């Protein structure tokens, strides 16, 4: 029995060290060399303080800020999740209708799909350009800014699809809100 057990335990230990320690450390080291910002979490700093991550959404609900997509996990990265409500769920329909009515009342514009539906992770840091543009008038009113200036700021933060092929154009909510704060008012 020991003749079979000893090689099995040695293999288990060796593979555990290889896949549980060596491989993750090697990938972390490679990432730190190739893309140090992303390896560190794409943190955004203001005056030496971390204000957020370009990759993790956070809630903004003031009228002078660009609002993110709804989140089933209240933007909690430790408890990220979707709502688990299916497409035929009456509860999901009621949530979407409630979000749509609130969005249209706040912004005076039709609600784009991403304004009323949560992302799968609940932490999406981006909204669609259409969603951001629809919020421009509300943001301008709340901040006492010219709507055209807010629209220009939003357009300056539109990120194209990856290599022009994959994904969709998107706007990082935190980046726009920090730019709005930097613009004053």
From Swiss-Prot:
Chain ranges passing through the membrane: 14-34
Record region (Disordered): 105-128
Keywords annotated in UniProt: ATP-binding, Cell inner membrane, Cell membrane, Ion transport, Membrane, Nucleotide-binding, Potassium, Potassium transport, Transmembrane, Transmembrane helix, Transport
Molecular functions (GO terms): ATP binding; P-type potassium transmembrane transporter activity
Subcellular localization(s) per the UniProt record: Cell inner membrane
Broad class of where this protein is predominantly found: membrane
InterPro entries registered for this protein in UniProt: KdpC
GO CC annotation terms, alphabetical: plasma membrane
Membrane topology (UniProt): Single-pass membrane protein
Domain of life, per lineage: Bacteria
Subunit structure, interactors included: The system is composed of three essential subunits: KdpA, KdpB and KdpC.
Function description: Part of the high-affinity ATP-driven potassium transport (or Kdp) system, which catalyzes the hydrolysis of ATP coupled with the electrogenic transport of potassium into the cytoplasm. This subunit acts as a catalytic chaperone that increases the ATP-binding affinity of the ATP-hydrolyzing subunit KdpB by the formation of a transient KdpB/KdpC/ATP ternary complex.
Stated family: Belongs to the KdpC family.
Name under which the protein is recorded: Potassium-transporting ATPase KdpC subunit
């Amino acid at each position: 029995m020991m003749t079979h057990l000893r090689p099995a335990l040695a293999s288990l230990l060796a593979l555990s060290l290889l896949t549980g320690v060596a491989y993750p450390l090697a990938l972390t080291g490679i990432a730190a060399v190739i893309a140090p910002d992303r390896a560190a979490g794409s943190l955004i700093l203001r005056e030496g303080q971390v204000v957020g991550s370009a990759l993790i959404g956070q809630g903004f609900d003031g009228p002078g800020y660009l609002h993110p997509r709804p989140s089933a996990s209240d933007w909690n990265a430790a408890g990220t999740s979707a709502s688990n409500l299916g497409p035929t769920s009456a509860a999901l329909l009621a949530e979407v209708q409630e979000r749509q009515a609130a969005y249209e009342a706040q912004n005076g514009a039709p609600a784009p799909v991403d304004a009323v539906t949560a992302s799968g992770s609940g932490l999406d840091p981006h909204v669609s350009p259409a969603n951001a543009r629809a919020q421009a008038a509300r943001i301008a009113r709340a901040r006492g800014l010219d709507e055209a200036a807010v629209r220009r700021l939003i357009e300056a933060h539109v990120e194209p699809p990856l290599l022009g092929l994959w994904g969709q154009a998107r706007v990082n909510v935190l980046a726009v809100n920090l730019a709005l704060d930097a613009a004053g008012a």
